[in-house]
Every structure is written in structure tokens, then in C-alpha cells.
């Protein structure tokens, strides 16, 4: 899938050095390399990389399947390239690959208004909070669910 200056493809083990670089700059409590290796090794997951014209990773997404529900576990873009449609395209591709009729869940920091707004555009809705979910500062996580397709899925970029 192409979107302007980037392409989305399956995430590969060879992408992990670039993924780790983005991860460390994007999150105060980054995933470990082992966590990424574990998720990529699961055949049922959807693990995607957004790459630029030189095949450099500019964003990535990890979504795991648990029984009948998909859990969006990690999504990040190169900090300097945020708000360029990368996350939106990764989410669109995830839903296309995992199924438009599937159920999805995720957790997001309650202070992350931009991410919450993006998820809402894809039909995710708040379903409560996980108190003190984030270890770095004890912030709550909003639990969001997407239980049915909506007319705005994958809309405007």
C-alpha cells in the first residue's frame, strides 16, 4: 500500500534497529527488542512498517489477536514526521488485513488527545479507564473499542 511518500509492508526482523530508534524517541517507557521479536514471531498478528522511498522505517504498528479480538498494542511514527498520515495509513491497513468486521481494542494515555481523536475517526469509542496504567508517571489509560465498522473508517487524511 502506498500513501504519498511512504509505503506500508509487513514488519520484518531486519527493521527492528530502526523500530527501536523510533520507539526510544517516541515513548518514555519503550518496548524492549525482545517484545518486538515476540510479537513479530506470532503468525496470527498484524505487524506493519511504513517506509519511505529509501525503505527507511518511518512508522510501525503491532496488533495481536486474542481469541476473537484484535489488540492494537503499539503504533508509532518518526517524531519529526507526525501528522503526515502515517499512523492513519497504518491503521487503515491493519483494519483491512485483520478484517473490517473484526473487533479491536487498545489502551491510550488519557492525555493523548491527538491519538484519541485519530482512533475515534476509525470508530473506536471509550469503554473506561485503567487507573495508573503507565509505569513512568502513573497516568491512567483510556480503554477504547471498535466493535462495528463506521462510515468514517479510513476517512480523510
Give the ranges of each region predicted by the language model.
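Conserved GNAT acetyl-CoA-binding A-motif
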Residues: 98-108
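Well-formed, non-transmembrane alpha-helical positions, independent of function
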Residues: 18, 117-118
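Acetyl-CoA-dependent GNAT
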Residues: 6, 10-84, 88-99, 147-156
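Conserved catalytic-core motifs of GNAT/GCN5-like acyltransferases
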Residues: 105-107, 120, 125-142
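Short glycine/proline-centered loop/turn elements that form peptide/ligand docking sites
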Residues: 87, 91, 112-115, 132-137
